[in-house]
């Protein structure tokens, strides 16, 4: 083997080179005396070859380093297919604006606006903003407001829940409000009716909250496309949910009265000046919150469309499906292809007014039957003045006319 020396080189650099300045291969060896092996060789052209595994940065939080750490969808609040802003909310639960983020509500007189706004911390263009518009300070026992996201069991198997090697999970997010507040973050095991909770404090400045939740060696999650975890933020609760004893970072069978029973819990409906801003939501394996994993808009949109999409108006008479006129009043089995494979067979709904055009007549339709699959939209609709056997286009004629396709959890 060629003898090597460590050379000071010039005043600014320290180099390792073969003696006499000759070209050669630099080899680093390791191992027991008499049994050393080449660990790293660097050719004269600079190519480095590692003989064994590079162990220094193989993992972040016990996971791979090439992305896909964040289990949450639309944590950057980029995608809002339904609407950028909705007001007067509070009477019923639902998905209203930002994709995958559901408002779960119960029996409250409080009302709020939910919006996607351009007021995120550095590096985040958007955030979710909640603004109370009607206060509710007389809180009945069964009242609640939870902001939640449900996750499929087949996307959570890496947590190894219910085994002796179950993983810790860290939830991190950026949050601020108009005033100081205390809320609760909960991971709810929908398969086994278990949950774990931690509280967090909100200030008037953007702060990153980092909450590491204990591993659960009891009760594995189902490996299917149904909801297994709900990651949720308690923002309002009556005594049914806040009248018990708060358990910090401990998995338990659900006791409803304990879920939001933290001391100093704040109701988002305590004043019409109350606001809450949220973005950069991440859930990952391990005890450390790594930097937020940003995804492109196109990728995030496709992930969200597994659960919901709506046809997009592109100008007068935008075609959203094709079919054949089965009679003068029926456009038989119209259809199109989903942009992505959906979680389950979707439900369809018509927003505004869609029309059927057969080359001469253009008449309003009403959905009659839905025979869609996870890959295709397929439906029958009623119309009028169609010609039997003609090809039919289903058209969107204005921005408010579209078809919604839903397979939410």
Regions found by a protein language model. Name each.
Residues 51-409:
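Extracellular and organelle-lumenal recognition/adhesion modules and their flexible linkers in secreted
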